[in-house]
Amino acid sequence: MSRYRGPRVRIIRRLGTLPGLTNKTSKLKSSSINQSTSNKKISQYRIRLEEKQKLRFHYGITERQLLNYVRIARKAKGSTGEVLLQLLEMRSDNVIFRLGMAPTIPGARQLVNHRHILVNDCIVDIPSYRCKPQDFITIKNQPKSETMISKNIELYQKSKVPNHLTYSSLEKKGLVNQILDRESIGLKINELLVVEYYSRQA
């Protein structure tokens, strides 16, 4: 299944607020589940499916990519669900988004694809590049890159940068301090349901 490129508001009406996908909010929110099913009993499969879809659309990844991340998480030490979230959160496009350098993850992905971003002084043009603790993220030394990202920071870095990251406006540099903990996830999600959804596939 390819990456979603359709109307974003339609998705958040069904699944609720997904800050990585869009900074818009839906008046209907995820209560649409209750409205659409009225008195019908919601199947456990559907609940798991919708949690999985939240992850897919929030992080802007394909079905195959998400399945691969689940497989990697299963082989790692610790809670599969927590490791899965850590893998997704440490993607370069998500780190740029969480630093406030882009309004959404698709916006951050575009910055990476267009080679505006450096990690440890090297251009990174792969959105799935996995950042590590002590990696530092800077802007390409070109007026276009600096102007664009400075504008984004001014407009979108409203909420506090999560504890596992630091951004210096003076140096125009972001730093990955550590692997994030569960409380720092910027999404309301039950990752265990996602792991259960893939239990027969991963």
Curated annotation (Swiss-Prot):
SUPFAM superfamilies: Alpha-L RNA-binding motif
Keywords on record: Chloroplast, Plastid, Ribonucleoprotein, Ribosomal protein, RNA-binding, rRNA-binding
Any GO molecular function: structural constituent of ribosome
Top-rank taxon: Eukaryota
Domain (S4 RNA-binding) ranges: 90-158
Keyword Oxidoreductase applies: no
UniProt xrefs under PROSITE patterns: S4
InterPro entries from the UniProt entry: Ribosomal_uS4, Ribosomal_uS4_bac-type, Ribosomal_uS4_N, S4_RNA-bd, S4_RNA-bd_sf
GO CC aspect terms: chloroplast; small ribosomal subunit
One GO-annotated biological process of the protein: ribosomal small subunit biogenesis
The keyword Membrane appears for this protein: no
UniProt record similarity statement: Belongs to the universal ribosomal protein uS4 family.
NCBIfam families, per the entry: PRK05327.1 (NF003717), rpsD_bact (TIGR01017)
Subunit and interaction comment: Part of the 30S ribosomal subunit. Contacts protein S5. The interaction surface between S4 and S5 is involved in control of translational fidelity.
Function in brief: One of the primary rRNA binding proteins, it binds directly to 16S rRNA where it nucleates assembly of the body of the 30S subunit. With S5 and S12 plays an important role in translational accuracy.
Protein name as it appears in the record: Small ribosomal subunit protein uS4c
Organism (species): Anthoceros punctatus
